[in-house]
């Protein structure tokens, strides 16, 4: 198939020194691109991999925890206007990613007229360039990613919570169970298998997130100053900025195998959960 041919060609290029200077006269160099990416600290790949793993872990932990407690709030019978809240909640998720990122870059994070800096100035503080250094840029990207991704996770958890039989909670209350006890022993075990596919899918999406990091910090002609790199932006930069196609292809193959390994482990985990 076309995909197999494309992947095979990428694998072949990863074993060559194809770049801007060796476009038509590239040579076979074996696993040199792989060793450069994985074994040489100055290649930048290991740093990008660490950033990607940190990015994925923090985003998913915060996303699931925050979504869980917001979804619990939606389960309150005395909460009025649930449909209105849920409808409003879908806007960040339904809005095109490019539009959301542009709005946040210009309307929220901009040094001169962004909302955050207007608030800081009003409070008597100086202006801050949120995208100029790596740590603030990382946190800014993560905040935007959470804003875009939380609605989906909230809706999935809300649906899972709605499917739990209320009689379990009534029995637990008769036994004197409190809020945390009910959540730990009833809610979480009951919804774990239901939301697992959504968590896995969102983890994949977060792991390979490109748009947010690129458009906030690295868009051509508008570099913010931060040198934040994930493995996806690292591969893109080597291919289309440095024109080092051999290394970029090797990184793409490494990413492919990382995703394959993660898929195998998550599928095994989901199967074991279903059998239990």
Show the residue positions of the predicted features.
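A structural signal for multi-pass alpha-helical bundles of membrane permease subunits
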Residues: 1-276
């Amino acid at each position: 198939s076309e995909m197999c041919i494309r992947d095979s060609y990428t694998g072949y290029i990863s074993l060559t020194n194809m770049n801007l200077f060796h476009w038509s006269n590239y040579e076979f160099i074996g696993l040199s691109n792989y060793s450069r990416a994985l074994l040489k600290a100055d290649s930048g790949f290991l740093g990008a991999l660490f950033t990607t793993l940190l990015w994925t872990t923090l985003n998913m932990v915060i996303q699931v925890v925050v979504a869980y407690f917001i979804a619990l709030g939606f389960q309150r019978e005395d909460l009025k206007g649930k449909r209105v809240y849920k409808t409003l909640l879908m806007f960040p998720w339904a809005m095109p990613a490019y539009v959301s990122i542009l709005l946040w870059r210009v309307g929220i994070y901009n040094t001169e007229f962004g909302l955050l800096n207007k608030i800081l100035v009003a409070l008597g503080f100086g202006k801050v360039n949120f995208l100029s250094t790596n740590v603030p840029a990382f946190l800014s990207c993560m905040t935007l990613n959470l804003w875009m991704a939380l609605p989906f996770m909230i809706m999935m958890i809300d649906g899972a919570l709605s499917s739990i039989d209320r009689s379990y909670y009534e029995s637990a209350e008769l036994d004197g169970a409190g809020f945390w006890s009910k959540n730990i022993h009833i809610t979480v075990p009951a919804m774990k298998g239901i939301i697992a596919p959504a968590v896995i899918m969102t983890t994949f999406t977060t792991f390979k997130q490109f748009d947010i990091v690129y458009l906030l910090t690295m868009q051509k002609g508008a570099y913010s100053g931060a040198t934040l790199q994930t493995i996806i932006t690292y591969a893109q930069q080597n291919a289309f900025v440095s024109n080092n196609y051999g290394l970029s292809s090797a990184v793409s193959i490494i990413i492919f195998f990382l995703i394959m390994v993660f898929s195998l482990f998550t599928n095994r985990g989901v199967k074991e959960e279903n059998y239990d």
